[in-house]
Amino acid sequence: MVIARGLLRSNASSSSSQAINLLKYVTSTGSLQGHTQNLCDASTRHFSSVPSPQSNSTEENGFKGHGMLAPFTAGWQSTDVHPLVIERSEGSYVYDIDGKKYLDSLAGLWCTALGGSEPRLAKAATEQLHKLPFYHSFWNRTTKPSLDLAKELLSMFTAREMGKVFFTNSGSEANDSQVKLVWYYNNALGRPDKKKFIARSKSYHGSTLISASLSGLPALHQKFDLPAPFVLHTDCPHYWRFHLPGETEEEFATRLANNLEELILKEGPETIAAFIAEPVMGAGGVIPPPKTYFEKVQAIVKKYDILFIADEVITAFGRLGTMFGSDMYNIKPDLVSMAKALSSAYVPIGAIMVSPEISDVIHSQSNKLGSFAHGFTYSGHPVACAVAIEALKIYQERNIPDHVKQISPRFQEGVKAFAGSPIVGEIRGVGLILGTEFADNKSPNDPFPAEWGVGAIFGAECQKRGMLVRVAGDNIMMSPPLIMTPDEVEELVSIYGDALKATEERVAELKSKKNN
């Protein structure tokens, strides 16, 4: 009933019949993850993440009413619901404070690529903490780990030559910094009007003021007075959802590229500074690009002297079976953002790489513009850099991208075998990243009623069986640790299938009640 109260509170604008149906549903199943979206706002529902079911912790060791203002969490949840508290990790698994074991199918937040117990990373952090726990990188002072990491990243990225690396603490900071760097670059070239950015609907580039503006998710804009006016959004390249009848993937990609060019011409090419894209869209629902998409988009932005920013925060370091997503899709970016797997998430760190053409301008024009007055106290933190250096060594020594190539076919095929389910609209993915979208009649135009919480039902069924997934409306996302074993892949597929069957049964009950 606690969850029901919160759900009813969050959906106060819905009809009374919807509220009654929702209350009946929650009390009858006890498994619904809180749906905080307004039932009348389909776009918000589609893009908003759903919390975990209430923890089984007792009142004594629970944390209901805790003092943390939690990210991407409705305020009432912190007060009314015990959070799921994770206490330790081991390989591809995490354990809650009650000792229950979960297969972590999202690798934390797309990030613990090497699992939760890699001793070499812990050793690297410990040794650096004893040697030099902190020093900054301002005013031409820095540390050996930051210099070594920059050198290693530049050598690892082979999609094209890159010139310099700038360190941040997260992917949000990386994309935020990209905007300031590009503005600085255009000011150095005497192009003060070339300042607009084009991103894509359903993209995710972070949650700071600027990176949230770049993101194309309504939940990141609503109630925050975003996006910023210098950010434009173009089409989402989701073929299943947005293609026209009879339109092939290549034709769809051509239409989107043409739409992008029309937007550029409408705004004026002299005002557009950069285009930013994830090689595979992550938080927007795991959306791989349609065939020829990046080939056509790159040609358009190059034609109008617009920089291409590859947001590799999720796709870098083996996730797709290549070291970088740019390798997979033949992207030749001018700038690259990365974070997450850079340290396997053991220590916060992010980075951006810039092409020689951009770094040369920053160098040559520095006497005119002065210093690049941007950075963070913890930019190039020596402990974070030491851990990241060790992570990069492991990715290469163990050939993690090749391991992903070997186990990902079973991961993809095993889950996609359930695509025939009557409640599944589409299952999509590449490498070790995969999304499931629930829909009625297998049509993107027939979503299930929001108050049913189909995605939330599936997430709760997975959690009950010992697997954590990400739920966002009726989208399910999985991005497991890159070290997964074949047996763990089989476990994932098995739990997915069992949870899907239970969800199908619940949807059938809801349909029956609706029709009676």
UniProtKB/Swiss-Prot annotation:
Q: Does the keyword Transit peptide apply?
A: yes
| Coiled-coil ranges per UniProt | none
Its main subcellular localisation, reduced to a broad class, is mitochondrion
Q: Which GO terms describe its molecular function?
A: 4-aminobutyrate:pyruvate transaminase activity; adenosylmethionine-8-amino-7-oxononanoate transaminase activity; pyridoxal phosphate binding
Keyword hit for Endoplasmic reticulum: no
This molecule's function is given as: Transaminase that degrades gamma-amino butyric acid (GABA) and uses pyruvate as amino-group acceptor, but not 2-oxoglutarate.
Q: What is this protein called?
A: Gamma-aminobutyrate transaminase 1, mitochondrial
